[in-house]
């Protein structure tokens, strides 16, 4: 992993200052849907309303505003409470997570501004400096410069980015264009939620933490570019609502259903063991409850794997609905990048938003 060269200041356990961890502190999907139900029908304001290609009504990863026939702005924001104890790693993870929404839409980040909340007393500002440097390091890796930001006094530390990117409006990847026959490819392993929960409790092995941090700080840039070149038009990134929750949103928007083969889903090292030991976040429990009635999990799927399918992820991979003819070559390209990409299922005709999870692919 890349390192931040600035001298580190002794820090308390940052995860002890947070009631949640990473994207597990998101408002639960059920509450978010309730909130936005009251906003449906509100008109987009201003003369550019007709050029708003993706907005709140679509529930996608980012907003998209067309500038002209060849350029569209992609705007997103994401921030969260500490997910790890190392300040620079937290900054790097939060930045990669925020940038991911631009990649999920098929865009490239241009610039960002910091969003930070920090206690006015009791936590050294030098620690926030390490967080910001970590975020700037990953943004620079993405070719995205950080142009200032905003801070507030808050007893619970929070950090993230508001990101502006650029995309071709004719080549956007959105959640509403998956079609039956598309092959579902996941580009990163899942399990960051159980690792973060165990870390917060001081029970995560160091090698497991290291693997999770490496995954969470890995940009989705290469995966996004490969997907665009393969002709993918339906995608999302897997974060706080878990794999099944984000798939459900894609399916509901696309008026389709899906099959998932649990044995094909890549898991982070140690994730199954931690799930089996009961390190399950409140966000994951909320995800599981929200998917009741939408996710039919075969009883033969191991209980810990079923948990991980709902596990609240932070800076997860892209979930791509790839055209059948393009899927094999796309999978090869992703694996050549060193990604643990896997074909985990397919889109099928069926009840909108529903997912059937089977133990393994039947030949």
What residue ranges belong to the model's regions?
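Glycine-/charge-enriched secondary-structure boundary and capping motifs
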Residues: 1-20, 31-35, 46, 50, ...
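N-terminal glycine-rich phosphate/pyrophosphate-binding loops that anchor nucleotide-derived ligands
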Residues: 2-104, 144, 179-185, 189, ...
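Buried hydrophobic positions in well-ordered alpha/beta secondary-structure cores of metabolic enzymes
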Residues: 23, 64, 98, 106, ...
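A generic local secondary-structure boundary/capping motif
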Residues: 52-54, 62-65, 100-103, 136, ...
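Acidic-glycine-rich active-site phosphate/pyrophosphate-binding loop
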Residues: 63-74, 217-223, 288-299
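Glycine-rich anion-binding loops of enzyme active sites
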Residues: 68-84, 89-92, 108-205, 346, ...
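Small-aliphatic-rich amphipathic alpha-helix that forms the alpha element of a beta-alpha
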Residues: 87-113, 130-141, 219-234, 238, ...
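Active-site glycine-rich loop that binds ribose-phosphate moieties when present
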Residues: 162-172, 207-227, 301
């Amino acid at each position: 992993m890349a390192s931040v060269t600035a001298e580190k200041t002794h820090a308390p356990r940052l995860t002890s200052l947070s009631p949640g961890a990473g994207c597990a502190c998101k408002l639960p999907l059920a509450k978010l849907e309730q909130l936005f139900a009251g906003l449906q029908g509100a008109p987009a304001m201003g003369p550019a309303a007709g050029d708003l290609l993706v907005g709140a009504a679509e529930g996608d990863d980012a907003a998209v505003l067309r500038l002209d026939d060849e350029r569209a702005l992609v705007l997103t924001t994401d921030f969260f409470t500490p997910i790890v104890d190392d300040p620079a790693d937290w900054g790097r993870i939060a930045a990669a997570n925020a940038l991911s929404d631009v990649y999920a839409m098929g865009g490239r980040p241009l610039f960002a501004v910091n969003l930070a909340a920090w206690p006015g007393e009791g936590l050294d500002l030098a620690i926030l400096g390490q967080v910001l440097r970590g975020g700037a390091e990953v943004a620079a890796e993405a070719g995205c410069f950080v142009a200032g930001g905003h801070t507030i006094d808050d007893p619970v530390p929070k950090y993230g980015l508001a990101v502006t990117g650029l995309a071709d409006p004719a080549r956007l990847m959105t959640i509403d264009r998956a079609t039956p026959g598309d092959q579902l490819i996941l580009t990163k392993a899942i399990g960051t939620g159980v690792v973060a929960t165990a870390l917060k409790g001081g029970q995560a092995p160091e090698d497991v933490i290291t693997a999770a941090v490496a995954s969470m700080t890995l940009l989705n840039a290469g995966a996004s570019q490969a997907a665009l070149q393969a002709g993918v038009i339906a995608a999302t990134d897997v974060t706080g609502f878990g794999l099944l929750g984000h798939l459900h949103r894609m399916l509901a928007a696309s008026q389709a259903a899906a099959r998932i083969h649990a044995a094909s889903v890549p898991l982070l090292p140690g994730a199954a063991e931690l799930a089996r030991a009961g390190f399950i976040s409140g966000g994951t429990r909320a995800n599981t409850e929200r998917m009741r009635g939408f996710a039919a999990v075969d009883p033969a799927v191991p209980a810990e794997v079923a948990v991980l399918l709902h596990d609240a992820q932070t800076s997860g991979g892209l979930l791509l609905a790839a055209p059948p003819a393009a899927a094999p070559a796309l999978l090869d390209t992703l694996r050549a990048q060193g990604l643990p990409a896997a074909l985990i299922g397919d889109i099928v005709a069926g009840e909108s938003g529903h997912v059937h999870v089977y133990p393994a692919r039947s030949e």
